[in-house]
Amino acid sequence: MEQCVADCLNSDDCVMIVWSGEVQEDVMRGLQVAVSTYVKKLQFENLEKFVDSSAVDSQLHECSVILCGWPNSISVNILKLGLLSNLLSCLRPGGRFFGRDLITGDWDSLKKNLTLSGYINPYQLSCENHLIFSASVPSNYTQGSSVKLPWANSDVEAAWENVDNSSDANGNIINTNTLLQKSDLKTPLSVCGKEAATDSVGKKKRACKNCTCGLAEIEAAEEDKSDVPISSCGNCYLGDAFRCSTCPYRGLPPFKPGERILIPDDVLRADL
């Protein structure tokens, strides 16, 4: 075990070493002797046990330190969110996690996974021959704990009351009636001097006797237009070849659409 990790251990620590791969018995025994000189209690667990969260023993939640990557280093590609979360559940509040990986490991990705799993203060201890890192568990951490959100205690009614009182006292509210003048309150007049139609009374504007606004000319044009016969087939102006048998314009030359045509009196007389 590296000296940088041994210096972080205390005599009252309960350490769990999570090993993986094939390890010779003498190597495991040597690691046990080396770590036992620094700590109070030591136990060994295989990494495969923590892959499934249902297989994690509740009695393992007594460790203050977890060493993962000894005696064989472990790849950061294996330390995913699920595995790191299962290892976190075995640590006491304020516990520490130490890992060792090959130098080719991606520290940025591992640091992100540690943070998302619930660890704090991820730190890189060494990267000479191996990537050795550490992370901690919050001292006030308890599994399944909950905290009230800070805005849940706010008094909404009191806040609105303060807003209303402060606005009236400082005079920040503008009275919209003071922005209107007397002329704005009068009923609008039509061009010819009579009251215009409102929403409640639908009056049609008529031209005055001495109209100068042009409304009289518009009404006269509408009356002239109403006197023009309306064609039922739309082909009266084309000529007799396109007119129906009862067309009053039969016998008259073609004319422009909309042109006023005077029908002679003898045309309307019967031939008999």
From Swiss-Prot:
Residues 1-151 are annotated as: N-terminal SAM-like domain. Residues 233-247 are annotated as: Fe-S binding site B. A motif (Cx2C motif 1) lies at residues 233-236. [4Fe-4S] cluster binds at C233, C236, C244, C247. Monomer. Its main location: cytoplasm. The C-terminal domain binds 2 Fe-S clusters but is otherwise mostly in an intrinsically disordered conformation. The N-terminal domain has structural similarity with S-adenosyl-L-methionine-dependent methyltransferases, but does not bind S-adenosyl-L-methionine. It is required for correct assembly of the 2 Fe-S clusters. GO terms for cellular component: mitochondrial intermembrane space. The keyword DNA repair does not apply. Pfam families: CIAPIN1. Gene3D superfamilies: Vaccinia Virus protein VP39 (3.40.50.150). It is found in: Cytoplasm; Mitochondrion intermembrane space. Component of the cytosolic iron-sulfur (Fe-S) protein assembly (CIA) machinery. Required for the maturation of extramitochondrial Fe-S proteins. Part of an electron transfer chain functioning in an early step of cytosolic Fe-S biogenesis, facilitating the de novo assembly of a [4Fe-4S] cluster on the cytosolic Fe-S scaffold complex. Electrons are transferred from NADPH via a FAD- and FMN-containing diflavin oxidoreductase. [2Fe-2S] cluster binds at C192, C208, C211, C213. Residues 151-185 are annotated as: Linker. It comes from the Eukaryota. This is Anamorsin homolog. A motif (Cx2C motif 2) lies at residues 244-247. Keywords: 2Fe-2S, 4Fe-4S, Cytoplasm, Iron, Iron-sulfur, Metal-binding, Mitochondrion.
